[in-house]
Amino acid sequence: MEALQNIGIKRRLRRFFRRDGRALIFAMDHGFEHGPTDFEPVWEHVNPRVIIRKVVRAGVDGVMMLPGMARIAGDDVKPEVGLMIKITSKTNLRPKAEQLMQSQLAFVEDAIKLGADAIAATVYWGSPQEDAMMRQFAEIVSYAHDLGFPVVQFAYPRGPYIDEKYGRKEDYRVVMYGARAAAEMGADMIKTYWTGSRETFAKVVDAAAGVPVLLSGGAKAENPLDFLKVVYEVIEAGGSGAVVGRNIFQRENPEPMIKALIRVIHRNEDPEEAAKAEGLL
């Protein structure tokens, strides 16, 4: 039975990764986690069906969204595109003291019923609520793996202890620790912060012990070339791609950025050449 479960996990992971072992995944959880103001730069993208259709047409390998958006726009994710459903989240409306906890929004079986190929959940490593999120993640992994579904951890070091000891959450030592902890808990894919250099991100990849590590895209870069350069460094460091939201949906026409990212991630193209080829420079 265990062998069959592992086959299911591997087959579903391949829905996100091309033969090169890399992936570009579009992230669409911002309306809940950050609020609809994230869509104000391009307001039509507040409609999930509008932006999902655009990114799927442009060639992303996967789409990540919360359960409610999967109900609304899941049909717009073509069968050849992987669907990742994140079942933990939080809002920015919470009191500050409670911002470092992710609550469970749905169960593994709910995501499966919505057509998920992978289940995602966040752990804020180092937060005062770390224990609760560890228990939550362990239960998700156990249940999903029993059914043959891969689990993605958004491994985000965060909290006052992290700030006090490391100075910033992107310090490679704590990002590396979070990635290793995610792998130790059974994650099949890890999304985490950029550490500032190829050399330090390579250590994060090494610490993950073979579990694919993808970049968390973060805030929109005003100069698209700057973001493409970061993604290039991630790939050169052994990273497996990127999960990108604002650097895509906060652009009036997201297609050139998506196609430039595909060039960098899947073809190892120089960022400047990729940007020029897609009219970003």
Swiss-Prot record:
Q: Which residues form the active site?
A: 191 (schiff-base intermediate with dihydroxyacetone-p)
Report the SUPFAM superfamilies cross-referenced here.
Aldolase
Q: Which CDD domains match?
A: DhnA
- As recorded in UniProt, coiled-coil segments are none
* This protein's UniProt keywords: Cytoplasm, Glycolysis, Lyase, Schiff base
Q: What class of enzyme is it?
A: lyase
Q: Name one GO cellular component term.
A: cytoplasm
- Tell me where in or outside the cell this protein is found: Cytoplasm
At the top level, the lineage of the source is Archaea
Q: Name the Pfam families on file.
A: DeoC
Give the Enzyme Commission number.
4.1.2.13
The protein's name is Fructose-bisphosphate aldolase class 1
Describe activation and inhibition of this protein. Activated by citrate.
Q: In which family does this protein belong, per the annotation?
A: Belongs to the DeoC/FbaB aldolase family.
UniProt GO molecular function:
fructose-bisphosphate aldolase activity
| Catalysed reaction equations from the record | beta-D-fructose 1,6-bisphosphate = D-glyceraldehyde 3-phosphate + dihydroxyacetone phosphate
- Species this chain originates from: Pyrococcus abyssi (strain GE5 / Orsay)
**Coarse class of the protein's main subcellular location:** cytoplasm
What gene name is given for the protein in this entry? Answer: fba
